[in-house]
Amino acid sequence: MCIRDSLSTYSLESGWYKFGGENHVVEINSIKISKDDLIIKLLNQPIKKSFALITPAVFGSNRLSFRTPQTSDFPKIKLMLTDKAIPYRHRTQGRLSRGRYAVPAGSVYVLEEPLDKSWWEWPEEWFPNEGISLKKIGSGLCLPLDIKGLA
C-alpha cells in the first residue's frame, strides 16, 4: 500500500477516486490549507540557484521529454542530483496519455543563474500540453533549497 500526500488547487470531496494511467483506486481526504500555512509560504518562495522536485517533472514538447525546460529563459544547469527517469502517464477524459519519462521526485537542480520565480510563476510553455498543460496536474512541483557553499 502506498500513501501519498498531494496538493491541489482544485477542491475534491473526500472519498474514493480512480487515478493514474492504470485507474488505481485511491482514498482522498481533503484538508483546506490557508494562505498562512507553512507549506503555502514555502511554495511561494522564489527559487534562487537550487531547488528539489517534490513531484515527478516532465518538461519539453508533446513529442519529447527533457530534464529541463528547453527555452532560453531557463538558466543552465550547473549540477543535478537525480535517479534514472521514471515512466509517467496520466488519464484525462477517459483517455490514457502518451507514455513519457519523467525526472523523479527528490531530484535536486543547481542552476548557474538565479531563477527568481516560485513554481507557481513558471510559464506553461515549459511543460508539454496534451489537451491539458502538465503543469496544471502538478508536473515539476518543487521547493527552493539553500545549499551552503553555493555561490
Question: How should each PLM-predicted stretch be described?
Answer:
Residues 4-151:
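Conserved active-site/ligand-binding neighborhood in enzyme cores
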